[in-house]
């Protein structure tokens, strides 16, 4: 079940040890989830045009972003999961930004159209290892997972795995784009990514989202709570943010950003019911 992966890192985008806290020199630092990048980057560009303030956005993973905000090396953390028990003790302010569904993706040549949550759990636990066991062709399942810093992994684990450990033979990748790319190029692969990244305008290859429990991962089913793998996306700050950072947050939550959030494949936080579990 091994898949060859080209290693790379986003850490150069934000040197955690080198950053100073605060919006000094007219710069706001935002770090965290790769899922949240489309929202954070579009808002950063528009906010910079309006205010002249520079907004540095980096996708290092939800856990890295939360750590950066808690130790003062970033002003805003973006996260595709809620705070865990230990993080809840850090004095962070939680700001829901959007609702999101986690899409289960396969290669376009894979004929499987639907998996139950139980089948997904057994696949990611290594109990189901061939697509023929779930109505597909006789082909080994190539598991693609996210790294432990990923908020998407934490949400998937919480909703799907029900205490079962992940199969250690899975390819473990550090970013949404990597997962999408590997699945698009590997006939037997399965992965999971934010619903908004399934049809990426930047990708050169395609993946296909399958139904889960016979429910399609679309905005309407996420908003209604019918799609089973749903979660919220968050910003976190360490206490009350500085005026410049608060202005950026207010812009992200404004009606002006709603259309951009929808175009990115998410549901603005002010629309629909809360999605899934943290």
PLM segments and residue spans:
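Sec-dependent bacterial lipoprotein signal peptides
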Residues: 1-17
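Exported/periplasmic ABC-transporter solute-binding proteins
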Residues: 19-278
């Amino acid at each position: 079940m091994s898949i060859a992966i080209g290693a790379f890192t986003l850490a150069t985008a934000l040197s955690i040890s080198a950053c100073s806290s605060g919006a000094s020199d007219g710069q706001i630092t935002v770090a965290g989830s790769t899922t949240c990048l489309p929202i954070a980057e579009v808002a950063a560009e528009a906010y910079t045009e309006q205010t002249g303030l520079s907004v540095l956005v980096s996708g290092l993973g939800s856990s890295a972003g939360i750590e950066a905000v808690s130790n003062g090396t970033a002003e805003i953390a973006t996260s595709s999961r809620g705070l865990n028990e230990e993080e809840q003790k850090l004095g962070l302010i939680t700001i829901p930004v959007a609702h999101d569904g986690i899409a289960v993706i396969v290669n376009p040549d894979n004929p499987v159209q639907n998996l139950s949550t139980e089948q997904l759990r057994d696949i990611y636990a290594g109990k189901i290892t061939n697509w023929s066991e779930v109505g597909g062709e006789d082909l080994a399942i190539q598991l693609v997972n996210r790294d432990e810093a990923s908020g998407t992994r934490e949400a998937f684990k919480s909703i799907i795995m029900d205490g079962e450990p992940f199969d250690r033979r899975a390819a473990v990748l550090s970013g949404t784009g990597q997962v999408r790319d590997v699945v698009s190029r590997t006939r037997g692969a399965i992965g999971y990514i934010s619903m908004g990244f399934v049809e990426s305008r930047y990708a050169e290859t395609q993946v296909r989202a399958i139904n889960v429990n016979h429910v399609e991962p679309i905005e309407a089913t996420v908003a209604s709570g019918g799609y089973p793998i749903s979660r919220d996306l968050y910003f976190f700050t360490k206490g009350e943010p500085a005026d410049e950072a608060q202005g950026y947050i207010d812009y992200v939550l404004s009606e002006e950003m709603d259309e951009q959030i929808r175009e990115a494949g998410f549901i603005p936080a002010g629309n629909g019911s809360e999605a899934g579990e943290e």
